[in-house]
Amino acid sequence: MNGIGCASVGPPAGAAPGKPAGVTVGEILRTHACDYIASRGGKVPAYELRVMQELAACRTAALGGHVSECDHCGAREYFHHSCRNRHCPLCGGAVRARWLDRCREDLLPTLYYQTVFTLPQELRLLTLANPKVGYDLLFKATAETLQEVAATPKHLGAKIGVMLVLHTWGRSLQYHPHVHGVVPGGGLSPDGTRWIAARDKFFLPAKVLSRMFRGKFLAGLKTAWREGRLRLEGELASLADHETWEKWLSPLYRKNWNVFVEPPPCEVAPHPEAVFKYLARYVSGVAISNSRLEGLAEGRVTFHWKDYRQDGHEKFMTLSAVEFLRRFFQHLLPPGFVRIRHYGFLSMRQRTQALPLCRQLLKLAGVVTPELGDPLAVPALPQAAESPTCQARLCPVCGQGQLRVVANWRRPTLPELMTMRVWSTVSSCNAPRRTPPPERPPT
């Protein structure tokens, strides 16, 4: 009998196609989590510790798994469970594919526009200290701005639908909170009897959006301060004084806030695949993918990133493992926070009745694009690979037999996982693993 691991018959989980398996966020955690915790003075919130533990244990024996065995040659593969944490670089792909498959029927046969609303640098420390308040306000100000400007007759005069996705990172892992939006290029007339299309390749004026967004966000921030919903500690402690607070806010009313509105990258091809491709970049994303990690050596992490200020030129950055983890974990979302939200006729309350009406009115208006055709006949998305537990697979060793599950070891409960030592206390040590079940002879 051959006892083989899954790494011997294919690239390990997280390896990019055509690229040798490299370092992962989980590996960095397993070797340097203790250093990171020490750099925080041992004071890490329980929720962050849970995320650290789950990401470090992802697809290792610590989370349990199963063994598949070939019924012809006896070759074995060992599969470990995924952590399913939404901050995990290994687990986002399958979630993204399933989400896109569920939402594909919502696409309308019209050009879509992308929007980006970004908070100015001066607000980042305050937002980082108050993520729930700051992110909720960012969503609210963005959605209200888009809908109110679109409803103005001189701009569009229509009720629109909006999907917003929160991002908190830049390409080099710096804290950069902003919201990406995807908006159909038009909307329903106020009386709901016709579709009002946006002008060719022009949706809404960015300058008007920027000014309204700025006013709404700052008004909401003032309300949060007045109601005592902001944590003002450390460097922010002086802002608890009313006069200091007003003086600090004042320049932000004169600053230009960055807002972008443009068609998708493939402007001349507004078909479903183009929209899906755009959506896929922003759904279930994490601060950095494992494919961008180049190396981990002597306590330092190297990764590549694109500098769009220099036409997307690829650069490399090396950080200490502790600094890398600090940057990574500043992008943790508050527990239970919803980072993808829908508004207008795309909201959960309206979409059931509004979307069929939109399709009907688009057809009557004669704006159905030939590339899109029937809006319901959208090609199926590639599905995430099914778990080997769900079906037998052809043996990659002999090419004749079927791999079938012959043994399982269960996933630990959260309390059990939190008591495990999944990271090392010495950076040169490998993370310990749970002992898999004893091998069972083939039946």
Language model features by range: what are they?
Residues 1-443:
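Beta->alpha loop/short-helix hinge microenvironment recognizer with preference
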